[in-house]
């Protein structure tokens, strides 16, 4: 069963937990703020596995993030320092979260090819003398996230060879009923009618975005809805809170 404070389809939750337990790779797709990253942390916590987080969409230097750097010291000369990623993949049963893989530089995909391959499972440290290979430890699971939707202009088309190394879980935005239940649990002091009105407005915006000719272009995520509710708690009206976000 999924955690009570987290809304996810039971079958998808079971599949996610099963893949982490067996050290298999999962790609979580869906709009920003729909719970992809949260689901990974909650599933890992459920299994008592450590999560190592790497935001590949934010790095402009994938070699430094995934392999390491060569440095020069005037006393000892040139030396190589391994990245945190190198040490993370050597920890048994670790969960490696590759956030925003869809925004990563293609060089990151090239580096990850052998790492994610279910048979090869190694990383070559080609920046280091003799280019040693690091084997991925037993039970390590790689969870990637990818945002989808027309508002994600920085998103790249992921290489087919990379996609084939993952099983897919599509995460959806919450229904109005589920979102209301979530907000009611998080903000029990907010008036019920206010929460219902908020969920209705958000639901109408999402429906508009999913039409053939939407007048709006930016999806309101569950994360955004929670932020609006926080502002309402602090005395903002629904309209003012929505405008600020």
Feature map (PLM): residue ranges:
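AAA+ P-loop NTPase catalytic core and its hallmark functional loops
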Residues: 1-196
């Amino acid at each position: 069963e999924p955690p009570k404070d987290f809304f996810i389809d039971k079958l998808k939750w079971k599949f996610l937990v099963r893949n982490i337990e067996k050290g298999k790779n999962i790609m979580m797709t869906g709009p920003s703020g729909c719970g992809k990253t949260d689901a990974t942390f909650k599933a890992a916590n459920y299994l008592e596995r450590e999560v190592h987080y790497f935001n590949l969409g934010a790095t402009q230097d994938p070699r430094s993030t995934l392999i390491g750097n060569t440095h020069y010291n005037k006393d000892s000369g040139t030396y190589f320092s391994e990245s945190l990623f190198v040490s993370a993949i050597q920890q048994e049963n670790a969960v490696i979260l590759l956030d925003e893989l869809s925004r990563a530089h293609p060089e990151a995909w090239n580096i990850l090819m052998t790492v994610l391959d279910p048979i090869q499972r190694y990383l070559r440290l080609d920046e280091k003398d003799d280019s040693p290979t690091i084997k991925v430890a037993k039970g390590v699971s790689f969870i990637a996230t990818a945002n989808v939707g027309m508002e994600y202009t920085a998103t790249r088309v992921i290489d087919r060879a990379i996609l084939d190394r993952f099983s897919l879980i599509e995460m959806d935005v919450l229904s109005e009923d589920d979102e209301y239940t979530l907000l009611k649990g998080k903000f029990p002091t907010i008036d019920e009618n206010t929460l219902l009105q908020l969920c209705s407005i958000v639901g109408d915006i999402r429906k508009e975005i999913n039409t053939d000719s939407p007048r709006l272009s930016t999806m309101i995520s569950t994360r955004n809805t929670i932020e609006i509710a926080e502002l309402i708690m602090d005395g903002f009206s629904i309209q003012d809170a929505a405008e600020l976000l």
